[in-house]
């Protein structure tokens, strides 16, 4: 197919005159294979008219000053810490570039730590992993003694493609290697320093009982001895509470693994807003821990009311039903038949429940529902919409609904709007709507007075 150049924006015949490009060099004209005949010296080019530094930035001197400043920083660093100076970086065709020689200070020493607390001898934490090349492959030496800061976590030549290793890359390498060796993720030889009889101080063991699930998992990754203590102590896993930020990451396999540490002695299981947990996982967990007394699944969208009833029926048929408290906030599709069956399985007396239960106040900012709620069942029928949800009371003493002797202000969050901060009902009162579409009553919307010194 022929190409049509009839509308091209440039001339079909190139000029025989030389042209000057931006770096100041002259480029010979194209002569279609003929010998260079040169151009007319009297020709005027647009670049000849323009000034070399139109904005007065003094680019050449500034560029030289920055290069010298980087070299001074490198010299000061080497003199202060006694490090040998890295070779200059070779770029492209092998010409030595002074700018990149100054920048080598940042590339070669960016991931090194001072010798005050994170190095062994004269070697850096990474065991001399950097070879001074900007685009080369960095090699990690094998662990031999104290020179390797990884504590033998890398095997073979430990090659890692890239200019340097970031903190996240180091964690990833350690995680994969320790997983293959069956060790604790993030542990090192400094924790047990070769002693087989390393143990945890009894005081630390008492402190572990006051930690939550996320903190226990963090402690178990410190060293091998703490990992063994946390995993083998069944008393630490009798009450398992999963909320933010673990709720978004925990899977069914992880939950089964955590509950197995209780060895059948778990008494309380609360998983808040865990979107990956299903009915089948909950049934398997309860089947292995039949002594459970409290079950809370608020906000777990993949758990259904039919799954909860199936778990309770199985426990009752086996004669092992000991569940006395259920938290089902956010569970959809609860009908009157479901609610009556729950009342029957939990053996709840409605008259006693109405007299001794504590009032519940609305507080949207509460990230994790409290486990101290002594209600046998957290949901109940809303007096207004007749749906089974969380029903809130009004904390305000001057509420109009309380003065009339009725419970007009007692309902779910959809039927009655409530203050985001204090939880009082907003009925015929002034309120302020926030940018996030939450409401504040007239009292909470007032700015707090500043203390005068």
Curated annotation (Swiss-Prot):
The F-box is necessary for the interaction with ASK proteins. The keyword Cytoplasm does not apply. Pathway: Protein modification; protein ubiquitination. One of its GO terms (cellular component) is cytosol. Part of a SCF (ASK-cullin-F-box) protein ligase complex. Interacts with CUL1, SKP1A/ASK1 and SPK1B/ASK2. This is F-box protein SKIP14. The keyword Nucleotide-binding does not apply. GO terms for biological process: negative regulation of abscisic acid-activated signaling pathway; protein ubiquitination. It comes from the Eukaryota. Pfam families: F-box-like. Residues 34-104 form the F-box domain. Component of SCF(ASK-cullin-F-box) E3 ubiquitin ligase complexes, which may mediate the ubiquitination and subsequent proteasomal degradation of target proteins.
């Amino acid at each position: 197919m022929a190409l049509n150049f009839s509308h091209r924006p440039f001339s079909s015949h190139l000029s025989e005159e030389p042209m000057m490009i931006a770096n100041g060099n002259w480029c010979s004209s194209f002569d279609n294979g003929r010998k260079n005949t040169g151009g007319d010296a009297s020709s005027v080019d647009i670049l000849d008219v323009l000034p070399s530094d139109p904005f007065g930035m003094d680019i050449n001197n500034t560029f030289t000053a920055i290069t010298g400043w980087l070299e001074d920083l490198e010299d000061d660093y080497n003199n202060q810490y006694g490090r040998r100076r890295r070779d200059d970086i070779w770029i492209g065709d092998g010409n030595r570039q002074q700018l990149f020689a100054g920048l080598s200070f940042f590339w070669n020493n960016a991931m090194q730590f001072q010798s005050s607390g994170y190095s062994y001898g004269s070697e850096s934490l990474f065991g001399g992993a950097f070879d001074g090349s900007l685009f080369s492959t960095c090699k990690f030496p094998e662990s031999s003694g104290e020179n390797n800061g990884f504590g033998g976590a890398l095997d073979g030549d430990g090659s890692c493609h890239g200019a340097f290793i970031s903190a996240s890359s180091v964690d990833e390498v350690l995680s994969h290697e320790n997983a293959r060796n069956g060790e604790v993720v993030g542990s090192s030889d400094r924790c047990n320093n070769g002693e087989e009889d390393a143990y945890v101080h009894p005081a630390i063991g008492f402190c572990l009982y006051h930690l939550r699930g996320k903190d226990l998992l963090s402690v178990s990754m410190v060293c091998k001895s703490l990992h063994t203590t946390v995993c083998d102590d069944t008393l630490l896993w009798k009450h398992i509470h999963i909320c933010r930020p673990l709720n978004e990451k925990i899977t069914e396999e992880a939950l089964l693994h955590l509950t197995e540490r209780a060895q059948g002695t778990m008494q309380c299981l609360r998983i808040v807003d865990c979107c990956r947990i299903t009915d089948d996982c909950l049934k398997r967990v309860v089947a292995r821990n039949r002594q459970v007394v409290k079950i809370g699944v608020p906000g777990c969208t993949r758990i259904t009311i039919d799954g909860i009833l199936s778990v309770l029926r199985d426990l009752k048929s086996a004669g092992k039903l000991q569940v006395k408290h259920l938290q089902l906030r956010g569970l959809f599709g609860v009908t009157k038949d479901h609610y009556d069956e729950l009342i029957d399985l939990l053996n709840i007396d409605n008259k006693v429940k109405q007299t001794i239960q504590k009032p519940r106040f609305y507080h949207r900012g509460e990230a994790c529902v409290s486990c101290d709620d002594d209600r046998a069942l957290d949901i109940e029928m809303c007096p207004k919409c007749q749906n089974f949800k969380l029903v809130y009371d009004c904390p305000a003493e001057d509420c109009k609904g309380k003065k009339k002797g009725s419970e007009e202000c007692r309902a779910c969050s959809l039927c009655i709007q409530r203050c985001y901060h204090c939880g009082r009902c907003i009925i015929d009162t002034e309120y302020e709507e926030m940018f996030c579409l939450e409401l504040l009553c007239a009292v909470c919307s007032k700015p707090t007075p500043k203390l005068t010194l």
